[in-house]
């Protein structure tokens, strides 16, 4: 019973940890967020939202449109907007790269746990289609300069949850087989070895990912500084706020959180 409970706990921990470590950390971790959906491509930077005003903002080559209307700008502001556009174009591929690594860490952890418990690399490979689905979604969105927070988060969570459910089924079968055939010691040896190896590899990847995220924060802060320097004001006198400040940066999400949760739960199953 304890073994089966650990299997269920593992799937829940993995799903929760993976979802929380999703791509949204790149802005929240820095203490910035945006209320807009964003598209960045060669034609410019388009920001849209359904609630609040302005609803649409478009930047390109030093020009600004707000709710479809071209805005008068000083030459200094035009230059700042060019720099903001260039910064956004440099930022989006890096956000996509970080998101891909988060997906990689998450599903490597899933696969490692499945193989350690079941002793079957073929069963571990069965969850690869969920990794492929998550990466394909990244390619269709962030990979093309498109960021829509709510749909993106839901899709990422769905891929992770589906993999967690499938993994739980494989683990349940593996644990039951080991329990009834007297091979629990083999499972324990595999999970011990897996835990040590995964700790080492995921720690290194987690530190590298954290460094990339911190560098991303520097780029976001530079964009915010340019926005704060704009002399332009919206009709009514308000500043243009494309980036919003939180009171303080959110606690950085551990990039290897899913791996650590998975290995800890898997280790408990062998005892």
Where do the language-model regions lie?
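Positively charged n-region of N-terminal signal peptides that target proteins for export
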Residues: 1-5
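N-terminal Sec/ER secretory leader and immediately downstream segment
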Residues: 20-130
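A cross-kingdom marker for long, charged
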Residues: 192-271
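Bacterial N-terminal signal peptides
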Residues: 6-15
């Amino acid at each position: 019973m304890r073994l089966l409970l650990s299997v269920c706990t593992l799937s829940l921990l993995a799903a929760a940890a993976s979802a929380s470590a999703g791509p949204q950390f790149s802005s929240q971790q820095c203490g910035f967020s945006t209320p807009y959906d964003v598209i960045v491509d060669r034609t410019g930077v388009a920001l849209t939202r359904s609630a609040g005003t302005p609803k649409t903002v478009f930047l390109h080559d030093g020009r600004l449109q707000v709710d479809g209307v071209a805005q008068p700008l000083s030459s200094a502001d035009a230059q700042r907007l060019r720099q903001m556009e260039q910064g956004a174009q440099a930022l989006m591929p890096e956000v996509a790269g970080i998101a891909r690594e988060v997906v990689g860490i998450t599903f490597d952890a899933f696969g490692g746990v499945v193989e350690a418990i079941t002793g079957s690399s073929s069963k571990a490979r069965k969850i690869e289609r969920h990794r492929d689905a998550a990466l394909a979604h990244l390619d269709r969105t962030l990979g093309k300069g498109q960021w829509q927070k709510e749909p993106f988060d839901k899709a990422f969570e769905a891929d992770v949850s589906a993999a967690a459910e499938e993994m739980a089924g494989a683990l349940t079968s593996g644990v039951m087989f080991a329990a009834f055939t007297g091979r629990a010691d083999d499972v324990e040896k595999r999970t011990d070895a897996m835990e040590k190896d995964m700790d080492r590899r995921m720690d290194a990847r987690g530190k590298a990912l954290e460094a990339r995220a911190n560098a991303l924060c520097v780029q976001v802060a530079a964009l915010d500084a340019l926005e704060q320097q704009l002399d332009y004001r919206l009709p009514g006198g308000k500043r243009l706020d494309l980036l919003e400040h939180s009171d303080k940066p959110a606690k950085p999400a551990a990039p290897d959180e899913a791996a650590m949760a998975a290995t800890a739960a898997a280790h408990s199953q062998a005892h």
